[in-house]
C-alpha cells in the first residue's frame, strides 16, 4: 500500500515540489496575461507565492495575494469563481495526466514575517537575547 508522504511528517516528494512550482509559474503567467474572461479578476494584480500539490497530484492549493494586499477577499472570490477556467488554461499549458483541481488560499507569509519582525524588535525580547548569547563552541 502506498504511503501518504505529504502528511507523514517527511514533507512533499520531489515530484510534488516540481509539479507545484510548474503550476505556480503557469498560473502566474495566465493571470499576468489576463487570459481569463472575467474583467473583475483581470483588474487585480495577483501574486502566486506557492502551490502545494496533493500526493496524487490531483489537487493543487495556490497561496495567493493581491499586490499591495488590497481587496484580498474580493480577489480570492474572483479566483474561486474562475477556478474551472483557470484549471483549463493551466492544463492546456502543461503535460500532466490529470489537470489538478485548483484551490485558492490567501498567502499569509508576509503577515507572519511582519509579526515575527515586530516581536523580535520588542525591548524585552532584545534584552532577553542579549542576556543569553549563544555558545559558538563546536
Curated annotation (Swiss-Prot):
GO biological process, one term: maturation of SSU-rRNA
Transmembrane portions of the chain: none
Gene3D superfamilies in the record: 3.30.300.20
Molecular function terms, GO-annotated: ribosomal small subunit binding
Keyword field: Cytoplasm, Ribosome biogenesis
Cellular compartments per GO CC: cytosol
Subcellular location: Cytoplasm
Primary location: cytoplasm
Name of one Pfam family that matches: RBFA
Oligomer and partners: Monomer. Binds 30S ribosomal subunits, but not 50S ribosomal subunits or 70S ribosomes.
Family indicated by similarity: Belongs to the RbfA family.
PANTHER family noted in UniProt: RIBOSOME-BINDING FACTOR A, CHLOROPLASTIC-RELATED
Function text: One of several proteins that assist in the late maturation steps of the functional core of the 30S ribosomal subunit. Associates with free 30S ribosomal subunits (but not with 30S subunits that are part of 70S ribosomes or polysomes). Required for efficient processing of 16S rRNA. May interact with the 5'-terminal helix region of 16S rRNA.
Record protein name field: Ribosome-binding factor A
Organism: Paracoccus denitrificans (strain Pd 1222)
Lineage: Bacteria, Pseudomonadati, Pseudomonadota, Alphaproteobacteria, Rhodobacterales
Gene, per the UniProt record: rbfA
